[in-house]
């Protein structure tokens, strides 16, 4: 059973993807729900609100214990929550589960959201449209990260470009800065499930 954290954000669209793949899933709103699952997706949304609700519903300790034995996939705000920070990121208390740090809303506000056709060669996922909505940028990466994919982004009003990490994984968890649930393409979810849920990769 795959759980989708359903406190805030785009949890419904993740469940639609899981249903399309044919994976049994439930919405996770408390510890009892969490304990029924073998993998967890933390969806995009508003990371400050998500951080507050994780504490309000007393899920922080449960998720941290869960992460020691089972896999978590975080998208956008979920990526922020999985990251490590020595101090609060604009009032967001991260879960410190994966060894990387981020900057929130680094592409700008909602009006600067965008789609970009990308390929994730290191994840065996060919071309698809990735949707970035107030996406975080990866600032630093620790030794625990085993695989990552960077793509080129042009700077505003410039011919120069920067390489930005948009997806990464360690030996148990995975996080991405885009929203793989939005365009209906199931391949990013399938990669996570095959590797960390079914153990096929």
Model regions: which residues?
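Cysteine-nucleophile active-site neighborhood
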Residues: 47-119
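Hydrophobic anchor at the start of a short beta-strand
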Residues: 25-26, 72, 173
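C-terminal and late-domain segments of enzyme folds
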Residues: 9, 113, 134-201
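N-terminal beta1-alpha1 cap of cysteine-dependent amidohydrolase-like domains
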Residues: 1-55, 62-65, 123, 186-201
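Pocket-forming structural segment of enzyme catalytic cores
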Residues: 87-164
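Beta-strand-turn-beta hairpins that frame and shape the catalytic cleft
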Residues: 1, 125-128, 168-174
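Redox-cofactor binding/interface segments in oxidoreductases and associated redox assembly factors
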Residues: 42, 74, 176
């Amino acid at each position: 059973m795959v759980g989708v954290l359903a406190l805030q954000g785009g949890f419904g669209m993740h469940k639609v993807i899981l249903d399309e793949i044919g994976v049994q899933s439930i919405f996770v709103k408390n510890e009892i729900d969490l304990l029924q699952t073998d993998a967890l997706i933390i969806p995009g949304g508003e990371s400050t609100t998500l951080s507050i609700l994780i504490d309000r519903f007393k899920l922080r300790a449960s998720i941290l214990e869960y992460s020691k034995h089972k896999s978590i996939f975080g998208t956008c705000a979920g990526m922020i929550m999985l990251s490590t920070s020595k101090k609060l990121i604009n009032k967001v208390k991260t879960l410190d589960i994966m060894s990387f740090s981020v900057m929130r809303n680094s592409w700008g506000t909602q009006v600067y959201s965008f789609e970009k056709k990308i390929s994730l060669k290191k994840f065996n996922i060919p071309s698809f449209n990735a949707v970035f909505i107030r996406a975080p940028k990866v600032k630093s990466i620790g030794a625990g990260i085993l695989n990552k994919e960077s793509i080129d982004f042009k700077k505003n009003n410039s011919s120069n470009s920067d390489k930005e990490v948009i997806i990464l994984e360690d030996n148990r968890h995975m996080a991405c800065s885009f929203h793989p649930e939005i365009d209906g393409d199931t391949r990013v979810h399938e990669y996570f499930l095959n590797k960390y849920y079914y153990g096929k990769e």
